[in-house]
């Protein structure tokens, strides 16, 4: 008896019925793997609804004629595997592999279904084209999710300053455990900045750290940075978000509580608040102090990095008001030993032991 709502089929070559059955199984299983990641990993209801609909549509077309042709015991491909299947070491790799698996299976259904089951062929084609776009959305969301998880766990952001041994100093900081680097360079030319940004991007990838670029959206896109950090006078958040996309991080410098409130309603991922102490980098900006930092943290849902003149001698006052994220320049970049300086700052940021 055929599935409900399906008309009878004519005679189908058992070999064709068997491969249609196998590829329907393949498609539905692969869609479920992707669906569960979108549900539990990304919490994206929109993607889950679409994937579930595709599974149900294919299920309605999985006729008993195809299932009865199944013969797993005599399948020469049963149990075969490839070394590449063992290399899926993160959710994005699993999603990409299963999307590819489903797309291939749907193409098989489309080709062999044309002569025996036109409705199956047309549905397979429609789902295959839809999956091409959904795969991009899912992978972008997965990358964004991973970046934001790293951001949420980040306590120490290193902001660079030009120096002859830039790469070595950043490398030492990353080795010590710094998980976010912001490339800031107001001197030199764009070719030099591009070379630096490429090298720092690769270095951060090696250490599993975030790499964001100060001000320059074009440079961030050119090196595929994890995000961009903008000041109050830079592009509006909605314009910047439109340029960098949803997957990249967008940080915003803030100096007042009004700045914080405004950023909290926009598509920002994190804030820098400062300067908390007087600093030579921005001598025209008055220090906001620990109390203002505490007030800012209380009115925003976003991670807030205290910035400005922070070092081991004054960090205690920030910790006393609940600060657990800082961004520094000189405390690491000007240190005699950047690795040790980074370790000491990270140690200071550890939550107190009861």
Cite the ranges covered by each PLM segment:
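Acidic (Asp/Glu)-rich catalytic clusters
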Residues: 170-176, 202-206, 221, 241-244, ...
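Alpha-helix-loop-beta-strand connector modules within alpha/beta enzyme cores
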Residues: 193-215, 232-255, 284-312, 345-354
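Catalytic cores of alpha/beta
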Residues: 211-226, 255-267, 299-306, 310-328, ...
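Histidine/lysine/aspartate-rich catalytic loop segments that bind and position anionic ligands
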Residues: 253-283
């Amino acid at each position: 008896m055929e599935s409900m709502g399906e008309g009878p089929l004519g005679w189908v070559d058992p070999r064709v019925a068997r491969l249609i059955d196998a590829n329907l199984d393949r498609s539905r299983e692969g869609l479920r793997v992707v669906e569960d990641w979108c549900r539990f990993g990304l919490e994206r209801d929109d993607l889950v609804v679409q994937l579930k609909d595709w599974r149900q549509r294919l299920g309605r077309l999985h006729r008993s004629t195809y299932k009865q042709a199944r013969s797993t015991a005599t399948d020469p491909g049963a149990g075969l595997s490839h070394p590449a299947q063992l290399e899926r070491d993160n959710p994005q790799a699993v999603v990409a592999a299963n999307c590819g698996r489903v797309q291939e299976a749907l193409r098989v259904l489309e080709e062999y279904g044309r002569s025996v089951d036109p409705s199956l062929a047309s549905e397979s084609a429609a789902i295959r084209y839809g999956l091409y776009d959904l795969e991009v959305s899912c992978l972008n969301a997965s990358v964004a999710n991973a970046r934001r998880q790293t951001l949420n766990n980040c306590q120490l952001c290193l902001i660079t300053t030009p120096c002859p041994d830039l790469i070595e100093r950043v490398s030492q900081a990353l080795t010590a455990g710094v998980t976010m680097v912001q490339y800031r360079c107001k001197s030199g030319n764009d070719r030099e900045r591009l070379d630096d940004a490429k090298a720092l991007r690769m270095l951060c990838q090696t250490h599993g750290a975030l790499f964001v670029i100060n001000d320059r959206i074009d440079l961030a896109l050119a090196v595929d940075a994890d995000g961009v950090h903008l000041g109050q006078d830079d592009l509006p958040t909605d314009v910047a978000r439109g340029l960098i996309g949803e997957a990249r991080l967008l940080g915003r410098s803030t100096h007042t509580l009004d700045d914080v409130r405004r950023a909290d309603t926009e598509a920002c991922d994190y804030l820098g608040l400062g300067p908390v102490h007087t600093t030579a980098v921005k001598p025209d900006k008055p220090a906001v102090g620990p109390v203002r930092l505490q007030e800012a943290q209380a009115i925003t849902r976003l991670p807030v990095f205290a910035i400005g003149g922070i070092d081991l001698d004054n960090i205690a006052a920030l910790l006393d008001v609940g600060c657990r994220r800082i961004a520094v320049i000189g405390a690491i970049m000007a240190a005699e030993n950047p690795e040790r300086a980074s370790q000491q700052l990270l140690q200071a940021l550890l939550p107190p032991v009861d």
